[in-house]
Amino acid sequence: MNNVFHAQTVGSPEAAQRAGIGLHLRAAIVLAVLALLALVAGASSSCPPATQRLYRQVVILGDPHLPGRHLAAKEQVRRTINGWRDVDLVVAVGDICDTYGTPAEYTAARSFFERLNHPLALVTGNHDYIYATPSRPDSGDFYPASPEEQADKLARFHQTFRLPALSHSRMVGGYLFLFVSADHDRYAVGIADRQLDWLRTELARAARTPTIIVFHGPLKGTQHPFKRYINKPHSVAQPVEAVQALLAANPQVFLWISGHTHTPATEASYASPINLYDGRVANIHNTDMKRETIWTNSLLLYPDKVVVKTYNHRQGAWQPELERVIRPPRF
């Protein structure tokens, strides 16, 4: 009994102290190692801030058609883009609403984009304003809305996304972006006179700044007729003559970003020499999001070039065969 008691009263305090020191030391070492691993992992997964990058990235969303079909695929696209840390701006090229630009569609669109973690710029498409909402929204009827109904829907677009104006401008990485909303009362993808006047004014102010125009409709003749309506009046930016004259008078415009024609990345017209308008302005066509396989284009804006990269969201991979390099004009 005495030996046992002696071990507990004399030997135990020192042993316990040594054991305690050892435990604290091991815990400190473990914590230090974990902190170091977290630091290394964070450094490898993060992206340099914009001030340290050589480029700015603008991600283009083709016609979202919200809520519409394949909503789960659209939400996966948003989650993927949210995970890209080098995104400076996300642009949606019109047809934000699925069909008629109803209040319910605008509510769904606002909810969708509120969960985007990057700055957003949008323009209108024909489905956002031009069609009259039928008594049965599932009827599939498409008739021009009255001027009053069109104006109400354009105002709803403006208010829903808190835009400075339906058409607006923004500088990104030394490039001027002009976001032009379709607002013509007759053409499906038309620019009304007041918007054309705004465009002329903006371009006159920036005659020596490389400029990119974002508009829902493509430029005429920049696609092969892979569908019967391609290059027809209701499928190209209107008025054709006014648009052509505007571009001819402003050599600083070198890129035109569009949607509307639902051009998939598997179509030859998606990335082709035919995309060059009047030998000078490259039209970048974008796939709609109303499908299981969604592609998005990214514009990587360098001081001396724009690299266009295409991402297949179903495969979770970039498609290097579609990569293009476009040089801005020099003044």
Regions found by a protein language model. Name each.
Residues 102-206, 242, 248-252, 266-309, ...:
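Extended active-site neighborhood of metal-dependent phosphoesterases/phosphodiesterases
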Residues 8-19, 25-26:
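Short, low-complexity, charge-dense intrinsically disordered segments
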Residues 45-108:
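N-terminal active-site segment of His-dependent metallophosphoesterases
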Residues 28-39:
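Bacterial N-terminal signal peptides
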Residues 56, 88, 167, 174-175, ...:
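Alpha/beta-hydrolase fold active-site loops
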Residues 190-192, 206-257:
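Active-site-proximal segments of metal-dependent phosphoesterases and phosphodiesterases across multiple
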